[in-house]
Amino acid sequence: MSKKLYIKTWGCQMNEYDSQKMAELLDSTHGFSLVEEAEQADVILLNTCSIREKAQEKVFHQLGRWKNLKDKKPDLLIGVGGCVASQEGDSIRKRAPFVDMIFGPQTLHRLPEMLNQLQHSKSPIIDVSFPEIEKFDRLPEPKADGASAFVSIMEGCSKYCTFCVVPYTRGEEVSRPLDDVLYEIAQLAEQGVREVNLLGQNVNAYRGETHDGSICRFADLVRLVATIDGIDRIRYTTSHPVEFTDDIIEAYTDVPELVNHLHLPVQSGCDRILTQMKRGHTALEYKSQIRKLKKVRPELSMSSDFIIGFPGETDEDFTATMDLIKAVDFDLSFSFIYSARPGTPAADLPDDISDQTKKDRLKLLQEQITHQALRIARQMLNTEQRVLVEGPSRKNPMELRGKTENNRTVNFVAPHSVIGQFVDIKITDVVANSLRGELVREEKEMGLRIAHSPADILANNHHMATPSNLDELGVGTFTP
């Protein structure tokens, strides 16, 4: 009888990726299968996030509920991972001594050894070190789950924004070697993945080492990923404006696989606040890069993160943020009321804005974004949109759902045989949080671009260009 594993995940897409890797790892080493309820599990893992307010207390509240399970089932093992574990490992050990394993984002690959150790000793294990890229060398081969997949290309962040805990919980920027990234994507493409989302806390800062010791920058990585047959869409998150350089904008001119959607967090539209946040750019510089990008991709949609009520934010400062939102025409935002993160420089600043003022500003910002999003959605009426079919509609299993390039969900009627493929859909209606449409053509009628098969790349020892096959831009393609 297989052992049962339950994983609860909070936070960003990187955490979702890490949780998937934990499940795959423990399946390959110990035969664990995932279950939907903690009550069914032999091992429970909590993958935590420290971004939101009161993240630590949320963890202890959850652990308190699971303590009751362990009281009834003494052999149950409980582990806490993620950014809160990295930041508050000693506190978790003291306040929740029943927790068996505490591990950081960079040590999740050591879970099998932790479980083996717990078979011989019941002493709690804590490992929140930063062994850089080691975890990727120890993870099992990827398993595709649908037509879209996340691939982590780097870890950590070296920007040290004053409000952010990431450099302290995930470490400084470390890029995966180029060959490793391309190999993982080729494996996923062999399993039917059509869209890849490149992940990193500061993904545009990717500087991956090649087989000959040189460095591959993010724009060149994108071009190489685009040559893999089957990968017809490329997304990436999260970006930093300082690293969103002109060579990346240039890639949008000749890499059609890059989608017409960009998530580029700006946090504030006020230069004074941006300086206090240590963001390294001005609102004008941000708008300038977006203006350049929209010259080559006029249909591109934009989303961003915003922090509301950062210490010292005045009404005029907030108005500058609203002006930026209108100027860029964002159609989606992840907006949060500021709350101090322990250990960050901003935590020492006086939190001098009332909760009600923060709530009022957040409401105004979200209303403006919603207004813009609805207008942009209505502009899509009667247009044809290429949609990657994800599966049955969540509301009507007789229909299918998929995602447009600009990240909108579309529901439509089509044969289930097109799941995992691209279809062209005419948009006929705009409803709350989604679109409706009619099937125009299936993928077999499209003639999508083919460059190199995943099998070619998997068979190649280096997966890297040689000087003889560089194009006029100095960008290479694979030699099968």
UniProtKB/Swiss-Prot annotation:
It is found in: Cytoplasm. The keyword Signal does not apply. Disulfide bonds: none annotated. Monomer. Keywords: 4Fe-4S, Cytoplasm, Iron, Iron-sulfur, Metal-binding, S-adenosyl-L-methionine, Transferase, tRNA processing. Residues 143-375 form the Radical SAM core domain. This is tRNA-2-methylthio-N(6)-dimethylallyladenosine synthase. The lineage of its organism: Bacteria, Pseudomonadati, Pseudomonadota, Gammaproteobacteria, Alteromonadales. Binds 2 [4Fe-4S] clusters. One cluster is coordinated with 3 cysteines and an exchangeable S-adenosyl-L-methionine. One of its GO terms (molecular function) is N6-isopentenyladenosine methylthiotransferase activity. The gene is miaB.
